[in-house]
């Protein structure tokens, strides 16, 4: 059982990671930018309330528009908050700041103080911190969409690029994406400045601090598969055949209406393509379109907790015969149901679900994500049943 679990764990931590990083083509890159950041404690003198959340909130809310399907969408106000603050400017000399790599949790560094309030580890998780990094883009990146993906930062994050306020995210337990395209310059050095403001007395447990998970720079063509823009779900599964439905959302930032061809192929991980599907899609300017289709898998290899068989769907977008994007969606084929007398059933077999109360931090290592430590946590939970 333990050996089988190690196989599953290896797939999640190694193959799964490679699948994410392999969402690339000639026009899509997902680059880890964890290395070589500069770090500073507190705001410079004179900032006062200029960067208080109450003032930045109207600029942060539009960053959530992609998640709002129905209801109000927020409009960003005019202006450039913080433009006169030294730390956001491209020519600011940060050479005296501390040099570090992400992920980073400043609170775990201490000092420990038994008199701190609450059950938060008695560690100084609150306060204001700044991170800065220089990025150099090639001239080949001109005309591309450039995104910043932050997997986790605690909390009330604000981001500037080349002195311009891009946006941010208030909530510390969610990943988020910002569009750097209007602010970044191809063929030049670009400076990111990121400010975190972690309030005191806002948590009943140890929340961690800092940019505590990975940070990515994503480059795509103007016409590309939307972030998290695919799904695969079962319609029929038995030992002989699996009938699956897939959806793919494609965004158009090309400045005009476009006609694209979407080609999606399906294969078991590490094996040859078993089938493919092609659709023609019209997408309005500054909009998106969705394609849905069925595919069948003969004699499917089912996913379960001991034999985590997986497949991958590769969606390629073509316009005028040129490949614009390639996006991989890993998935497993399985059936799940709840019954009144057996409880949870996976592929027709009873599986006991046991829960634990586990926060996102890694004990004495703090909240900064560590792959080996997370693997250890999974091993322990698996051994618990």
Task: Give short role names for the model-derived ranges.
Residues 28, 229-230, 314-383:
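N-terminal carbohydrate-binding accessory modules
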Residues 1-25:
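Bacterial Sec-dependent N-terminal signal peptides
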Residues 161, 241-282, 289-293, 315:
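Beta-strand-rich binding/interaction modules
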Residues 178-183, 293-308:
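Signal that preferentially marks extracellular ectodomain short beta-strand elements
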Residues 20-114, 191-197:
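Accessory carbohydrate-binding/adhesion or oligomerization-edge regions at the termini
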Residues 193-195, 312-316:
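Extracellular recognition modules
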Residues 31, 42-44, 76, 83, ...:
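Accessory beta-strand-rich segments of carbohydrate-active enzymes
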Residues 218, 282, 330-334:
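Short beta-strand edge segments in extracellular beta-sheet folds
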């Amino acid at each position: 059982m333990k050996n089988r679990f190690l196989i599953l764990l290896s797939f999640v931590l190694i193959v799964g990671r490679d699948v994410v990083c392999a969402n690339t083509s000639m026009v899509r890159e997902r680059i880890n930018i964890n290395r070589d950041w500069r770090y500073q404690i507190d705001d410079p003198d004179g900032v006062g309330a200029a960067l208080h959340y109450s003032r930045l909130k109207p600029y942060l809310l539009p960053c959530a528009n992609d998640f709002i399907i129905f209801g109000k969408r927020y409009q960003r106000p005019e202006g450039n908050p913080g433009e006169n603050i030294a730390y956001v400017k491209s020519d600011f000399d940060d050479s005296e700041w501390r040099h570090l790599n992400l992920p980073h949790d400043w609170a775990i560094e201490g000092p420990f103080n038994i008199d701190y309030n609450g059950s938060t580890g008695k560690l100084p998780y609150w306060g204001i911190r700044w991170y800065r990094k220089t990025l150099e883009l090639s001239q080949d990146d001109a005309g591309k969409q450039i995104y910043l993906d932050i997997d986790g930062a605690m909390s009330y994050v604000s981001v500037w690029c080349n002195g311009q306020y891009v946006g941010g995210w208030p909530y510390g337990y969610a990943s988020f994406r910002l569009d750097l395209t209007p602010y970044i310059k191809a063929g030049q050095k670009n400076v990111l400045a990121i400010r975190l403001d972690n309030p005191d007395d806002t948590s009943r447990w140890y929340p961690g601090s800092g940019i505590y998970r990975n940070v990515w720079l994503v480059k795509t063509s103007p016409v590309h598969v939307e972030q998290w823009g695919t799904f695969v779900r079962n319609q029929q599964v038995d030992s002989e055949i699996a009938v699956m439905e897939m959806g793919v959302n494609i965004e158009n930032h090309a400045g005009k209406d476009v006609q694209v061809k979407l080609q999606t192929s399906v294969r078991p991980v590490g094996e040859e393509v078993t089938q493919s599907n092609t659709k023609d899609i019209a997408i309005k300017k500054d909009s998106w379109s969705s394609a849905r289709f069925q595919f069948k898998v003969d004699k499917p290899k089912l996913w379960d907790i001991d034999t985590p068989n997986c497949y991958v769907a590769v969606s390629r977008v073509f316009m005028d015969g040129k490949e614009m994007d390639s996006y991989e969606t890993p998935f497993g084929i399985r059936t799940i149901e709840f019954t009144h007398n057996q409880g949870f059933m996976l592929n027709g077999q009873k599986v006991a679900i046991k829960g634990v109360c586990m926060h996102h931090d890694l004990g004495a290592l703090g909240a900064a994500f560590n792959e080996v430590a997370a693997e250890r946590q999974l091993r322990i939970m698996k051994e618990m049943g």
